[in-house]
Amino acid sequence: MNVQIREIFLDDLASLWEVAYRNPNAEWTKWNGPYFKDVLPTRREFLEKVGPTDFVHNQFKNIIIVDKQIVGMVSAYYEDGELKRWLDVGIVIYSTENWQKGIGKKALKLWIDYIFSIVSLPHVGLTTWSGNLRMIRLAKRLDLEKEAQIKKVRFWQGKYWDSIKYGILRED
């Protein structure tokens, strides 16, 4: 299995929308910060506005390719906004058929290495929630250090969950 990450091009948007956003009730939406209740873009919104503006040629968003097919996305964002000193990464593998196959581990490792190559920051973080056991296992498998656990700050399905922060230093 050949796992790659790469920049998103305009030609990728239709395929990316099909894989990621076609089904608004896709299983991945239940694990990727579901407490935010984000609304997925329509095909038209994604192809005409959101995709070209926020995804195409964005150094902080790459697609994950396995055997020439889009299977997910990696991303990064500044926790501290315009200060740009605190960067977190994220990953989504869209289809459950591609879960538990090591794709996430390979892709996130490539992504963290890439992020360290384009920014001069000493630290990269990853934030998840206590209900997302797969993401917690992934962080541990990549030797990210658990740096914080903020108790009961994420409310989902009638229950409070913890926010969990992991990180890695450049020299690690």
How would you name each of these model-derived features?
Residues 49-52, 114:
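A generic secondary-structure signal
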Residues 52-57, 144:
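Short loop/turn motifs at secondary-structure junctions and domain boundaries
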Residues 13-21, 43-48:
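An amphipathic alpha-helix signature
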Residues 25-49:
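Conserved GNAT-fold acetyl-CoA-binding loop/helix
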Residues 24, 53-54, 119:
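A general structural signal marking secondary-structure boundaries and capping sites
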Residues 1-15, 19, 61-172:
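Acyl-donor (CoA/ACP) binding surface of acyl/acetyltransferases
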